[in-house]
């Protein structure tokens, strides 16, 4: 199977996201690469499902919360950028501050 560098990147993101999903389901807090992969995969899937760039920029901020990542990770991830394939071509989706820190999250 011959894959382009972009296709290899997407497969690596997907693989890391699957691992992150399994850990999240077990209640294990995600580290930096797992959190970025999890958010990135959600954006890539959303693009394949037909969501717009604007919808994905909003959606990307709802995928993970403060309690699902290790301490300090939400502050480390200032933005996530993903090149996603849409029906009209490839576009860069940027999600700023994807893991929002909420007071009620800290109490859980």
Curated annotation (Swiss-Prot):
Q: Which GO terms describe its molecular function?
A: nickel cation binding; urease activity
GO annotations under biological process?
urea catabolic process
According to UniProt, the reaction catalysed is:
urea + 2 H2O + H(+) = hydrogencarbonate + 2 NH4(+)
> InterPro entries this protein is in?
Urease_gamma, Urease_gamma/gamma-beta_su, Urease_gamma_sf, Urease_subunit
Q: What does the record give as its pathway?
A: Nitrogen metabolism; urea degradation; CO(2) and NH(3) from urea (urease route): step 1/1
Q: EC?
A: 3.5.1.5
Coiled coil ranges (UniProt) are none
Q: Fetch the Pfam families from UniProt.
A: Urease_gamma
User: What is its subcellular localisation?
Assistant: Cytoplasm
Q: Which keywords does UniProt give here?
A: Cytoplasm, Hydrolase
S-S bridge residues:
none
Q: Do the record's keywords include RNA-binding?
A: no
User: How is the quaternary structure described?
Assistant: Heterotrimer of UreA (gamma), UreB (beta) and UreC (alpha) subunits. Three heterotrimers associate to form the active enzyme.
Q: Which HAMAP family match?
A: Urease_gamma
User: Which protein family is it in?
Assistant: Belongs to the urease gamma subunit family.
Write down what this protein is called.
Answer: Urease subunit gamma
Species of provenance: Trichodesmium erythraeum (strain IMS101)
Classification from the root reads:
Bacteria, Bacillati, Cyanobacteriota, Cyanophyceae, Oscillatoriophycideae
């Amino acid at each position: 199977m011959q894959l382009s560098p972009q296709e290899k990147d997407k497969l690596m993101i997907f693989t890391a996201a699957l691992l992150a999903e399994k850990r999240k389901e077990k209640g294990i807090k995600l580290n930096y690469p797992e959190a970025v992969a999890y958010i990135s995969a959600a954006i890539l899937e959303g693009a394949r499902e037909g969501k717009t760039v604007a919808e994905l920029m909003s959606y990307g901020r709802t995928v993970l919360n403060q309690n699902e990542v290790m301490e300090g990770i939400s502050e480390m991830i200032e933005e996530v950028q993903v090149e996603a394939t849409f029906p009209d071509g490839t576009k860069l989706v940027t999600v700023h501050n994807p893991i929002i820190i909420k007071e009620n999250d800290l109490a859980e």
